[in-house]
């Protein structure tokens, strides 16, 4: 059978949602140039970012942990999807509502952060790039952008039961 080492050889992306330490330094060395590593096992990722960067300085890595850059966590989605759904009385969560959320997160990542957010993350580079792919969980713009976009998507897909409030 095929092993994980076989699967990651020359791979561009590793998506892990499994167990701590399963992606080894030797495996990472075999990946394509500028690999994207999504090591999302919690609380310990499949490979720690400091090890990944030591072995492959060209990699982009995200984990589910708040103590590393690029925290991929549902905390960026769920509260704002629900806020938008509740605000318009959505009868269900649709794919278009989830996509509206994701698109707003992507758009926010490319914009300059507020002074308030920068102060909360003193000393961390919060400019779109390898160490800042998605907004931080404490970015106050998330609720202001995502909830209305989700409510709008609910209205457009016919699941809203009341008008969208002014945000």
Identify the role of each PLM range.
Residues 12-13, 36, 60:
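Short, Asp-centered acidic motifs that coordinate Mg2+ and/or phosphate
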Residues 39-147, 151-163:
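Adenosine-phosphate binding glycine-rich loop
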Residues 28-34, 53-56:
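Short, conserved loop/helix-junction motifs that constitute active-site signature segments
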Residues 1-30:
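A structured beta-alpha segment of the ubiquitous adenosine-cofactor-binding alpha/beta core
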Residues 165-167:
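Short linear loop/turn motifs
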